[in-house]
């Protein structure tokens, strides 16, 4: 059993992660970042929960780029095949639940 205080985790570089758990082929990680990730498509489902900070989530629907601002407590669900990019607005901490080894 472990307890985590997400606001206290700081990485040494953008998208550093603290591994929290693995079950089946699913991983749960707490990420720290202050820079955008990259456009990508996961090979499975993804749950992206903002624990601290603010993140602009851009995603594509039928080739059109759309955007939504996620604040602390907000959750983004990407179904398999959803192309997206997370763009933090300053420092952010996010909990990501996804297929083990996913991009």
Name these PLM-found stretches:
Residues 62-80:
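Short acidic-glycine-tyrosine-enriched beta hairpin
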Residues 80-103:
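Ligand-binding loop in jelly-roll beta-barrel domains
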Residues 30, 57-58, 96:
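Short hydrophobic/aromatic-rich beta-strand segments that constitute the beta-sheet cores
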Residues 38-41, 45-50, 67-68, 86:
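His/acidic/aromatic-lined binding-pocket segments of jelly-roll/cupin-type domains
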Residues 1-30:
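A short, N-terminal "cap"/entry segment at the start of jelly-roll beta-barrel domains
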Residues 35, 44-62:
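Glycine- and acidic-residue-biased ligand/ion/polar-headgroup-sensing regions
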Residues 26-42:
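Conserved short histidine dyad/triad with adjacent acidic residue
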Residues 24, 51-52, 71-72, 90:
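A cytosolic small-molecule/anion-sensing beta-strand core signal
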